[in-house]
């Protein structure tokens, strides 16, 4: 799954420039019901600005409340350490950054440094749904020993009993025993028959 196929392209984004006031940033976020927006100008990506960051800054720095939101520019408080990825990177890399960097999006920048778009948490959830084939077919969850041939054995049972595999995911349950959970989405009119054959073959059904 390439990033370019799931990113929100730059021409569909609402952005703000580094020299704009933080009041303008707040107004844009309020108007569009956003929690954060990218900071960019032309093809250059600078970072992100969020409501939380603005409010925290304002209440820490303006205790006398005499200063105004118009007194400060976006570049003075924006987050500049937003991770970037290439359009041809895999979505797994974007998911990793979103998890470990605590950001609302990952910026997509090409090899020339041109800002192309962003990858959001929503995009990751969508790809996760597609990967697992949710809302498609029937779900079969099997506990199998981590030994060679188990996957081949399962798929053979399914195909021999008029089943079509939509998706196949192997999950490590982090247990003390050497087993894996295999989650399969199957398109079939013989689901019960497949269940029985899987059980007869020694697999445990979850």
Residue ranges and their predicted role:
Residues 1-12, 50-86, 90-100, 111, ...:
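Tandem CBS (Bateman) regulatory domains
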Residues 16-18, 35-49, 85-86, 104-119:
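Cytosolic beta-strand hydrophobic patch enriched in CBS
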Residues 29:
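OB-fold/S1-family RNA-binding modules
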Residues 176-182:
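A short, glycine/Asx- and small/polar-enriched loop/turn
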